[in-house]
C-alpha cells in the first residue's frame, strides 16, 4: 500500500508543479502507425488487419501541442520492446513527460526539472511521511543539483576511478554509475545533470 501511495505522491507532485508553471495536461494516443523516436524497438500488433505499434514516447504529439499551448505535459504508460536482463530497463513504465516552447537554453529545462523535484520532495515529506516511514526511505537533498559537461564527466571518471575511455561519444552503464558516485563524493548529491551530450547520439 505504501509504495502505491508514494507513486501517487510523485505523479501528484509532477502535475501540481507543472500546473503552477502554466502547463496544460494532454492525453496522447498509445496505438500508432509508427514510432515517435528512434533508438527503441517497438511492440507490433494487428489493428483490425492493419499494422500498428504501441507508442514508445509521446514526443511527436508533445511537439505538435506546444504549437497550441506553449507548455504541455503528460503522465502515461510507454512501451519499449527491448530484450534485457538488467535492472536498468523496463518494457513498460509510467513516463512523466513535459515539453516547453520559446526557451533560451537547455538550462531552462534543467531549472524546471529541479523545481519539480524540489516541489515533489517537499510534498512527500508533508503528506506522505507515514508511507516514507513504513518503507524506511530517506529522501535525497535536491536543494541544488550539480551539472557537469559530458567530456569532463568522462575524464573525471577515467582519472579518479582508473577506467579507460572506450567510447568517446556515449556513456556506458558503468560510467553512468561512476558519474553518480562522483557526484555523491564531490557534491554530496544523488542527482547530477550531464550537459553537452554529443548530438550524434541524440
Describe the predicted segments one by one:
Residues 1-103:
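Class II aminoacyl-tRNA synthetase-like tRNA-binding/catalytic domains
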Residues 4, 52, 65, 99-110, ...:
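Hydrophobic alpha-helical scaffolding
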Residues 15, 110-113, 154:
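A generic alpha-helix structural signal
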Residues 28, 36-41, 115-202:
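Metal-assisted phosphate- and nucleotidyl-transfer catalytic regions
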Residues 61-64, 91, 108-113, 130-137:
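Low-complexity, flexible helical/coil segments
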Residues 66-76, 111, 134, 192, ...:
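Short, mixed-charge, low-aromatic patches
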Residues 69, 96, 104-126:
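His/Asp/Glu-rich mid-to-C-terminal helical/loop segments that flank catalytic regions of hydrolases
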Amino acid at each position: 500500500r505504501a509504495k502505491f501511495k508514494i507513486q501517487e505522491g510523485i505523479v501528484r507532485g509532477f502535475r501540481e508543479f507543472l500546473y503552477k508553471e502554466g502547463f496544460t495536461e494532454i492525453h496522447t494516443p498509445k496505438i500508432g502507425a509508427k514510432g515517435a523516436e528512434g533508438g527503441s524497438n517497438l511492440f507490433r500488433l494487428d489493428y483490425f488487419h492493419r499494422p500498428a505499434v504501441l507508442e514508445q514516447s509521446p514526443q511527436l504529439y508533445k511537439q505538435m501541442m506546444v504549437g497550441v499551448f506553449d507548455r504541455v505535459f503528460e503522465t502515461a504508460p510507454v512501451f519499449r520492446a527491448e530484450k534485457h536482463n538488467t535492472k536498468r530497463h523496463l518494457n513498460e513504465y509510467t513516463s512523466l513527460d513535459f515539453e516547453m516552447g520559446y526557451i533560451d537554453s537547455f538550462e531552462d529545462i534543467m531549472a524546471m526539472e529541479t523545481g519539480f523535484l524540489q516541489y515533489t520532495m517537499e510534498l512527500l515529506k508533508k503528506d506522505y511521511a507515514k508511507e516514507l516511514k513504513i518503507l524506511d526511505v530517506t529522501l535525497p537533498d535536491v536543494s541544488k543539483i550539480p551539472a557537469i559537461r559530458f567530456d569532463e564527466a568522462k575524464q573525471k571518471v577515467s582519472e579518479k576511478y582508473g577506467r579507460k575511455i572506450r567510447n568517446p561519444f556515449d556513456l556506458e552503464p558503468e560510467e553512468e554509475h561512476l558519474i553518480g558516485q562522483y557526484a555523491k563524493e564531490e557534491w554530496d548529491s544523488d542527482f547530477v545533470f550531464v550537459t553537452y551530450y554529443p548530438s550524434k547520439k541524440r
